[in-house]
Amino acid sequence: MKLRSTALVKGFRQSTPYVNAHRGKTMVIMLGGEAVADRNFGNIISDIALLHSLGVKIVLVHGARPQINQLLEKQDCHTPYHKNIRVTDEYSLGVAMQAAGQLQLAITARLSMSLNNTPMAGTQLNVMSGNFITAQPLGVDDGTDYCHSGRIRRIDIEGINRTLDQGSIVLLGPIASSVTGESFNLLSEEVATQVAIRLKADKLIGFCSEQGVTDESGNVLAELFPKDAKQILERLTESQNPAEDMSTGTLRFLKGAISACRAGVPRCHLISYKVDGALIQELFSFDGIGTQVVMASAEQVRQAQIDDIGGIFDLIRPLEEQGILVRRSREQLEQEVHRFTIIEKDGLIIGCAALYAYPEDHMAEMACVAIHPDYRDGNRGQILLDYMRHQSKSRDIDQIFVLTTHSLHWFREQGFYEIAVDELPMEKQGLYNYQRNSKILALNV
């Protein structure tokens, strides 16, 4: 009899909602030349092929910066940079075209063989490259002629969409032609960012050497709004040598993520190309593994609805079994669901609280406060309390009270103070359980 892996079963169950959510979505994935050169590159390609097999529409953009540098060094040729952009002369353009062409063939070959030795062996995976990008020269800046370094002039969005709808992966590189037939070397980060924006992609995903963006203590910041990300970008730009970012890519990707998010791409992810399975962990788990730059948080605070009863029930049941919360039947939840406020993340209810108003006394009880065990290190309790206070003010409530047996200190930290049973509304006094002996605390709204 084969041993069954509980972790595998649990992981598969948790990932199922994301499989359905991502199917049919368009994702632009940016692979810098550093990622292509890393030993984990083969695993990244396998994960991209897996995404494609799950119905995700993929545009893969690759860079070639280290490969170009390597070829130039072999030929004892060095190109200058101006404002962190390579000045591509006639000779280095030929080298760039050679490096980009080799990478395009290598990536195509890897994708084509990525499903070998898997249950999906024999499945056709088409990779399409083409003249989807039209370039134009960067021109002269502060007296420096960028020569064959260029920028995007036009993107054939209809052509890309048509190719994606046919079931192919679109592969784009850093070399593009102009309307006059000249070739230009583009910033791959700009290509990925602009394609994601104009394609109205659901996600932009960038691989860098670091596992996303970290705070000053080295902890990965799971979620950033563009404004906060911009401040971090400015701080890192001041402290980091531009040459260092040439090898890590964090600043380049973060800059692109901010631009894309502000232009309407809902979620932009930064993950590490050094971590095996980072792409899968980021897209198919509750918390991900890297950093998201988002316009709207993945967590939503809202009034509970009838469809939320099952999630609320699952959240509070362990606390009821421990005696922390008073037991509520499913029938009671159905009758009182309109009193509940929930915090929802990707379809999972991770927090809840209920408000029971006593209008004649201008008081309200905040009850059934619960936070999912995996999310108790944040400020979600404070968020629920603030929501309760806002509701109370709008309903002419002057005071919120709670009955607690385990969270006395937390409520005191929020400004609650102890009151006696006879200070409760008369209706609540008659329901007070002296055997449970809960502490009663109040907060002036």
Curated annotation (Swiss-Prot):
GO terms for cellular component: cytoplasm. One of its GO terms (biological process) is L-arginine biosynthetic process. Pathway: Amino-acid biosynthesis; L-arginine biosynthesis; N(2)-acetyl-L-ornithine from L-glutamate: step 1/4. The keyword Acyltransferase applies. GO terms for molecular function: L-glutamate N-acetyltransferase activity. Its EC number is 2.3.1.1. CDD domains: AAK_NAGS-ABP, NAT_SF. It catalyses: L-glutamate + acetyl-CoA = N-acetyl-L-glutamate + CoA + H(+). Gene3D superfamilies: 3.40.630.30, Acetylglutamate kinase-like. Keywords: Acyltransferase, Amino-acid biosynthesis, Arginine biosynthesis, Cytoplasm, Transferase. It is found in: Cytoplasm. InterPro entries: AceGlu_kinase-like_sf, Acyl_CoA_acyltransferase, Asp/Glu/Uridylate_kinase, GNAT_dom, NAGS_kin, NH2A_AcTrfase. The keyword Transmembrane does not apply. It holds the Pfam family Acetyltransf_1. HAMAP family: N_acetyl_glu_synth. Belongs to the acetyltransferase family. ArgA subfamily. NCBIfam families: N-Ac-Glu-synth, PRK05279.1. This is Amino-acid acetyltransferase. The lineage of its organism: Bacteria, Pseudomonadati, Pseudomonadota, Gammaproteobacteria, Vibrionales.
